[in-house]
From Swiss-Prot:
Belongs to the peptidase M24B family. It comes from Trichophyton verrucosum (strain HKI 0517). Keywords: Aminopeptidase, Hydrolase, Manganese, Metal-binding, Metalloprotease, Protease. It catalyses: Release of any N-terminal amino acid, including proline, that is linked to proline, even from a dipeptide or tripeptide. Its cofactor is Mn(2+). PANTHER family: XAA-PRO AMINOPEPTIDASE 3, XAA-PRO AMINOPEPTIDASE AN0832-RELATED. Its EC number is 3.4.11.9. Gene3D superfamilies: Creatinase/methionine aminopeptidase superfamily, Creatinase/prolidase N-terminal domain. This is Probable Xaa-Pro aminopeptidase TRV_02643. One of its GO terms (biological process) is proteolysis.
Length: 507
């Protein structure tokens, strides 16, 4: 389709929001296919019995504490998976034996309709969604009661014990909350063609936003302008927004993995790490690009320093080689290890790492010294959540369980595919491949302080050399990759490498 260009003037600065080469697709295009019932059938096939009732609540409207304003709405992903419904205050049941999907929409509220417009009604829901029956919410309790009376020995499958559709009174309901999540996760981790198209659409919006930022980077003075333009382009292209909080970290902020303040000036800094992805129809993209700040570059060069260019080249090599290894049957943990092997080789070449007298390269590997500069996993599953479900998400490592108990981790955290116990990659999985190298002052100073301790990482670090790289901050490059039977398909089209530099410098 033909690309288009929209020029916006802000405070005397001309910004071309959609530069040539950005994703110029039909904004009026609608997502006409709803695979909700197909997904419900897939889930049912994974349950222990091919009889029973599945119940899932959608996200309800919730007010912020001590406020009359609604919290930002985000549809519950498990509910969306079997309905495709994006509106709030809905519920769904699926009678497995009868193959009947019933959607419950909010009861009509005259006052609410006057103030905020009509909620999803029965006729509209019947036209828009692939369901067998639509009822108002007030019918839910009676329907479940009658189903239970007719099927007294069958289970009602729910995700969590606190998500019961009816409080047991006169009927002995058999609620089963152990099987449904495992079944849904097993289905969600393998994307069908419709889901892949939605993830690719999200990536196209992300690509357009990243292009716009690169083309207009020379106008910007603050991280906030980068983050703001990304959201602007996403909304303009009919995305509901971003799939997660945008990370626009300049200078040392780029060494903080999930930096989201996005409010500091760009002046005097070399690089920006921009981790920002659009959402499309509840499906996420997750894209990271690292690029030089034009005001820090002089003399016709592309990079603000030799150190920045070197680190970018290493991360680029890490990503390219790792993506080439993604295929059905591969162990992502092994690909993750390959990324660390490249980091070790290259950091030794730069003199950032060293092999002390009496030590060997194997000692550096055993000490996991590269984790000082590459402290996160190579990637994660992607889908309805940016950190999407895994096939074995019901169990998590002990150390993660401890973090969850401390309140440091959501209870919905899923096992990443780069753990040793994760199953091999399978066709239909979508994963991120996001190697990075970071020069985090806190981590470096701690390693320096502990360098004389046995088994410390600092023993293998040349801290004088490291200081030359601290101003780089960090570099991360991230793409969303579909695993296929023949290898993989990269779903991300945001510029990187030479194409990225050409956009920044208008070449």
């Amino acid at each position: 389709m033909a690309s288009y260009s929209v020029t916006v003037s802000v405070a005397g600065t001309s910004i071309n929001k959609y530069p040539a080469g950005s994703a110029g697709f039909d904004l009026a295009m609608a997502d006409s296919y709803d695979p909700g019932k197909q997904h419900a059938r897939r889930v049912a096939a994974y349950l222990p019995k091919q009889q029973g009732l599945i119940y899932l609540p959608g996200q309800q409207t919730v007010l912020s504490e001590d406020s009359d304003q609604d919290r930002p709405f985000k549809q519950r992903r498990y509910f969306f998976y079997v309905t495709g419904v994006v509106e709030p205050d809905c519920h769904v049941t699926y009678d497995i034996a009868e193959d009947k999907l019933t959607l419950y929409v909010p009861d009509f509220d005259f006052k609410r309709t006057i103030w905020t417009g009509p909620t999803l009604g029965k006729d509209e829901a019947n036209q828009r969604y692939d369901v067998d029956r639509v009822e108002y919410f007030s019918a839910l309790e009676g329907d479940v009661l009658r189903w239970s009376q007719a099927n007294p020995s069958l289970s009602i499958y729910i995700l969590h014990p606190d998500q019961r559709p009816v409080t047991p009174l006169t009927v002995a309901y058999f609620y089963e909350s152990k099987s449904l999540k495992h079944a849904m996760d097993a289905c969600r981790v393998i994307k069908d063609e419709h889901e892949i198209q939605l993830i690719q659409r999200a990536n196209r919006v992300s690509g357009a936003a990243h292009r716009s930022i690169l083309a207009n980077l020379h106008h910007f003075k603050n991280e906030a302008q980068i983050a703001g333009l990304f959201i602007d382009v996403c909304l303009s292209l009919r995305s509901k927004g971003t799939a997660y909080q945008t990370i626009a970290g300049s200078g040392s902020n780029g060494a903080t993995l999930h930096y989201t303040r996005n409010n500091e000036p760009l002046a005097g800094r070399q690089m920006v790490v921009l981790d920002a992805g659009a959402e499309w129809s509840c499906y996420a993209s997750d894209v990271t690009r690292s690029f030089p700040i034009p005001s820090s570059v002089s003399g016709g060069r592309d990079w603000p320093s030799r150190e920045a260019e070197q680190i970018y080249a290493i991360v680029q090599r890490m990503q390219e080689e790792c993506i080439s290894r993604v295929k059905e049957g591969a162990l992502f943990f092994s690909i993750h290890q390959h990324a660390h092997a490249i980091a070790l080789e290259e950091l030794l070449k730069l003199g950032i790492l060293r092999i002390p007298q009496g030590s060997t390269k194997a000692d550096l590997i055993k000490a996991e010294v590269t984790a000082l500069f590459f402290p996160h996993g190579l990637g994660h599953h992607l889908g309805l959540e940016v950190h999407d479900v895994s096939p074995d998400s019901g169990t998590i490592p002990v150390e993660l369980a401890i973090e969850r108990e401390k309140g440091l981790m959501s209870v919905t955290e899923h096992r990443p595919p780069c753990t040793l116990s994760a199953p091999p990659l399978a066709s239909g999985m979508v994963i991120t491949v996001e190697p990075g190298l970071y020069f985090n002052r806190l981590a470096i100073d701690q390693a320096r302080a502990e360098r004389d301790e046995p088994n410390s990482k600092g023993r293998f670090v040349n801290f004088d050399v490291v200081e030359r790289y601290v101003d780089v901050g960090g570099v991360r490059i991230e793409d969303d990759v579909l695993v296929t039977k023949d290898g993989n398909k990269n779903l991300t089209d945001a510029p990187k490498g030479k194409e990225m530099l050409d956009l920044i410098y208008g070449r």
